[in-house]
From Swiss-Prot:
InterPro entries: Asp/Orn_carbamoyltranf_P-bd (IPR006132), Asp/Orn_carbamoylTrfase (IPR006130), Asp/Orn_carbamoylTrfase_sf (IPR036901), Asp_carbamoyltransf (IPR002082), Asp_carbamoyltransf_Asp/Orn-bd (IPR006131). NCBIfam families: asp_carb_tr, PRK00856.1. Catalyzes the condensation of carbamoyl phosphate and aspartate to form carbamoyl aspartate and inorganic phosphate, the committed step in the de novo pyrimidine nucleotide biosynthesis pathway. This is Aspartate carbamoyltransferase catalytic subunit. L-aspartate binds at residues 84, 169, 221. Belongs to the aspartate/ornithine carbamoyltransferase superfamily. ATCase family. The gene is pyrB.
């Protein structure tokens, strides 16, 4: 068994993936987008467990599973024994005992997956669909696929990530891998929402200092659900100070692209009429999510078969 297969028993954090593995997943995602097929004859079983609300991640994993011909075991948190006090560990232990091959999990607890993948009893593979404000590897991979399709490389690209940095698992996943891939990173947004850990990966700037220099301008959602109740900014003030206005859009380089992991607070992070503007790749990101998640599932299942 190769080192690559061993490492992909689970996909839980971008920190755990090598650059080679990341590039293979991106390129395989592009192959799936171009029509590659891989029907499974042994009917692997996948269960999606979402303990936080989701549209894009949840549904694109479902579409990816359908396209791969996998068997899906529906799991509804609201009608499960979780509501009787069952722990996440015991829930996954049960699904593993039932023969589920892969569990795709989103959970509010950061690093929830560590206990699961360390268990000698749980044999199901874990794909992290987002852990609180920790990591979001599949979102990061679809972002990378979108950038790679546009530019064909990462080395030397200037990438700005702007918005609610501290609460964003997308920012934390992307900053680590983009630096390893050779991109130059800039971070913008309210000072109240940026911790010192970002300084290890790039420069803190204002959006107006960097908007006309970047190749990729990535905005982040203001995550109201992870903030204390007292609002720091009104929507109007936030948009004026930190959002993509028409004036800022006009300053982007001709070849620059606009990204956002969504859901979008329109007229907060990005002006409503700019969400689908010519430089926007937001819809493409959503589309690419299906294909890169197909690549993730394929790689995890291949690793299981190799075992």
């Amino acid at each position: 068994m190769s080192e690559n297969q061993q490492a992909l028993n689970h996909v839980v954090s971008m920190e755990d993936l090598t650059v080679d593995q990341v590039m293979k997943l991106i390129k395989r995602g592009i192959e799936f987008k171009n029509g590659a097929q891989l029907p499974y004859e042994d009917h692997p079983i996948v269960s999606n467990l979402f303990f936080e609300d989701s549209t894009r991640t949840h549904k694109s994993f479902e579409v990816a599973e359908i396209k791969l011909g996998l068997e899906r075991l529906d799991f509804d948190v609201k009608t499960s024994s979780v509501n009787k006090g069952e722990t996440l560990y015991d829930t996954i232990l049960t699904l593993s005992a039932l023969g589920v091959d892969v569990c795709v999990i989103r959970h509010p607890e950061v690093d929830y997956y560590r206990e699961l993948i360390a268990s000698p009893t749980i044999t199901t593979s874990i794909i992290n669909g987002g852990d609180g404000s920790g990591q979001h590897p599949s979102q990061s991979l679809l972002d990378l696929m979108t950038i790679y399709e546009e530019f064909g490389h990462f080395e030397g690209l200037k990438v700005a990530i702007a918005g609610d940095l501290d609460h964003s698992r997308v920012a934390k996943s992307n900053m680590q891998i983009l630096k390893r891939l050779g991109a130059e990173l800039f971070f913008a947004g309210p000072e109240e929402w940026r911790s010192q850990e970002f300084a290890d990966y790039g420069q803190f700037v204002t959006i107006d200092e960097i908007i006309d220099q970047v190749d990729v301008m990535m905005f982040l959602r203001v995550q109201h659900e992870r903030h204390d109740s007292g609002a720091v900014f009104s929507k109007e003030d936030y948009h004026a100070q930190h959002g993509l206005t028409q004036e800022r859009y006009d300053r982007l380089k001709e070849t620059a692209i606009l990204m956002h992991p969504a859901p979008i607070n329109r007229d907060v992070e990005i002006a409503d009429h700019l969400v689908e503007a010519p430089k926007s790749r937001i819809v493409q990101q959503m589309t690419n999510g299906v294909f890169v998640r197909m690549a993730i599932l394929e790689s995890v299942l291949a690793s299981r078969n190799a075992n």
